[in-house]
Amino acid sequence: MAGNSRRRGAVRKAGTKKGPTVGSGGQRRRGLEGRGPTPPAHLRPNHPAAKRAQSPPRRPAKRTEETETVLGRNPVLECLRAGVPATALYVALGTEADERLTESVSRAADSGISILEVPRADLDRMTGNHLHQGIALQVPPYIYAHPDDLLEAAAGSLPALLVALDNISDPRNLGAIVRSVAAFGGHGVLIPQRRSASVTAVAWRTSAGAAARIPVARATNLTRTLQDWADRGLRVIGLDAGGDTMLDDLDGSDPLVVVVGSEGKGLSRLVRQNCDEVVSIPMAGSAESLNASVAAGVVLAEISRQRRG
């Protein structure tokens, strides 16, 4: 009878090829009451999605800088004379000493830098078989300041004078500008995190040690940082050959950030739009432009002159 739960399942007749087979009649059927809908994948204990959900979150990768190695007797000696922070001086065994090597070893010892004598083959491998003249200096990555640190550096000696670099890719220009900032009473230098020169041993050496005194900060977004500084009371002065204001007419008494563009590209469009003024340097003769570091030095010297009264 239909609906009779005690009714046994179908029974195959005896004598068939497969023989009699007895069904369960529903007696051994697993009960489904109360099980509910199938849970989502991340809630099933053995599902890969659940294991991924239970694992600790991955930390975002941090952008790191590699240690720099300065090669050659003249470059190494210049770095040590300029006070470039270094962790180790490598000298190849059997290297013939001259005045440069002797002075380099002496300066490294006086500065507490480790001096390691290594087989020439090891130094070749460390330097990628580049010309090293038997000596190499290991320089750790530069520790950049935060943009806010530059404002704090200027807080005790207002008015502030900061320099920002736009499209400057040559580390020698960066080092020379840092040197000018130190010479003319500036408080810090701001560079973009991407598409910009960084503080390498070359930049440090060109700064003649000023990089040890003047903080250099990196901005994730240069335009946004300039806008933030403008909101905090700084006037943003762009430096470009096609500027509307001549340097002679610039009022340098206010808190300023001077934005320096490259000699070739000048200021980028967004940076230029966020400048309160764009200043150009009057020049005589047929010269069309100045090197970026030279132009920055001229402007900083004029601002310093005005502030001295």
UniProtKB/Swiss-Prot annotation:
Family from the record: Belongs to the class IV-like SAM-binding methyltransferase superfamily. RNA methyltransferase TrmH family.
Protein species of origin: Mycolicibacterium paratuberculosis (strain ATCC BAA-968 / K-10)
Positions of region (Disordered): 1-70
The protein's name: Uncharacterized tRNA/rRNA methyltransferase MAP_0479
Gene3D superfamilies associated with the record: 3.30.1330.30, 3.40.1280.10
Gene Ontology MF term list: RNA binding; RNA methyltransferase activity
CC per GO annotation: cytosol
Keyword Methyltransferase attributed: yes
